[in-house]
């Protein structure tokens, strides 16, 4: 969960959220963004229709897979077809979209320009700093390479990147 919302994936691969959703982290195009506490779950959408075919958890420790990650106010997840999606506040560009714009619905995260290239994503994870106003996400490729976006300490001396950046093998 983020600071404000909880999430669940149903058996049929639909993603639901509930909670306060002040910063777009409801992923429902704003229908939950009415302030206060939303105790009824809402379907996460892509802006016009509900998201389906979300890869189901069933985290397999031997394969080291994680398919949904949360940070302070953003969410990153994988679909069954291997595509990466995210939504939320996007603090410091943590979603890896190349910008810091908030999005209140799920959008595909383009990783085609990442170098070295990623053939498929094995897992995702989220990180929150001690002050909760900095967040980052990581991708682990099927080749076991680590890529990070958002607030972090990068090998080139930068502390924030808005696109996924290769870190290590």
Language-model region placement:
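Structural signature of eukaryotic scaffold interfaces centered on beta-propeller domains
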Residues: 1, 57-70, 124-131
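Structural signature of WD-repeat beta-propellers
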Residues: 2, 10, 36, 71-72, ...
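Beta-rich catalytic cores
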Residues: 2-3, 71-72, 102, 120, ...
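Conserved core positions of repeat-based scaffolds
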Residues: 4-8, 17, 61, 74-77, ...
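Short glycine/serine- and acidic-residue-enriched loop/turn motifs that recur at repeat junctions
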Residues: 18-46, 87-109, 147-169
């Amino acid at each position: 969960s983020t600071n404000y919302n909880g999430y669940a994936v149903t058996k049929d691969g639909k993603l639901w959220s509930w909670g306060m959703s002040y910063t777009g982290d409801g992923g429902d195009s704003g229908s939950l963004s009415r302030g206060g506490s939303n105790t009824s779950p809402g379907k996460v959408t892509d802006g016009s229709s509900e998201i389906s075919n979300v890869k189901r958890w069933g985290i397999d420790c031997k394969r080291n897979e994680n398919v949904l990650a949360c940070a302070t106010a953003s969410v990153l997840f994988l679909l069954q077809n291997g595509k990466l999606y995210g939504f939320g506040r996007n603090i410091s560009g943590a979603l890896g979209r190349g910008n810091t714009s908030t999005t209140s619905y799920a959008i595909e995260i383009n990783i085609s320009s990442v170098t070295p290239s990623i053939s498929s994503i094995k897992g995702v994870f989220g990180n929150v700093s001690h002050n909760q106003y900095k967040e980052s996400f990581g991708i682990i490729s099927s080749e076991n390479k680590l890529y990070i976006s958002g607030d972090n300490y990068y090998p080139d001396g930068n502390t924030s990147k808005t696109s996924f950046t290769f870190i290590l093998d």
